[in-house]
Amino acid sequence: MRPPRRQASALLLVLWALILLSGAVFAYAKWIQADIQLHGQVNREIEAGAMCHSGMALALHELVTKETEGLDEDFAPDLGFRIRMVSEGGKLNISLLIQGEQPERLDILKKWLEGRGLDYKERESFVDCLLDFVDGDDVKHLNGVEDDTDYQPPNRPLESIDEIEQVANSGPLARSPGWKDDLTMFSTGLDLNAANEDVLRLLGISEPYIVRFLQTRRGRDGVDGTPDDQLLADMKIVGAYLGLNEVRLKSLQGFITLKDPTLRIISEGRSGNVTRQVEVVARKGGATPQILLWKE
């Protein structure tokens, strides 16, 4: 018969073996769980990306508009996409505002800068510096800056809204929260069917005319971008609503429009707790949309 001490030692060895085996099994189980979670997360990211791009493909179709149903689609409780489409024509096209240095357009720009908190001196300085930034010569505007020791404007058209921050004396504007949201470089003109109250005021339109025009344009629900909107297609009729006579309309020709085809489209795809977003600026109006910006 085996001595008790040897039996105890054997039992301890068995217990240690069981403990080690249990630890190994537990570690393996945790590794498997982590691997499953990792692959699950990867799958979520793939699904969210697929939803996002599916939504964008739908939005870019020539027949799809802001009023089209199905722009917010759920395929499962945690799987789907949401599309937002906003007219880029409701913003101020900075390139058109400074093109040709037309006094009436520069006046609109200066009014906007005033609303952004810039005083007279800051407005005059920034506008002249902006003109020096984009013109094709080294002749300085009255309040502008051309070649200096540590500043050389490129003397070419703007390439992006962000580039405005490189213009001399742009600091006061850059410190104004959300200023970039008011500007665009992609529209074909200021779309009066998309412009809000603040933008319409920049054209020198009085408040009663703005109120009446927006009530008509927005329809019974008082909201832009809904099926009951009444978008006007005749510039003379719009001019009458806004109190703009023929002379004033002619002075704004080439800057205002009634149907800008440029849209900023944001498609957000979701899968579980993962979301993916694509932002596109596109000009629609034919079978193949013109992509002006694609950002993921």
Predicted stretch roles:
Residues 2, 9-296:
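Compositionally biased linear targeting/interaction segments
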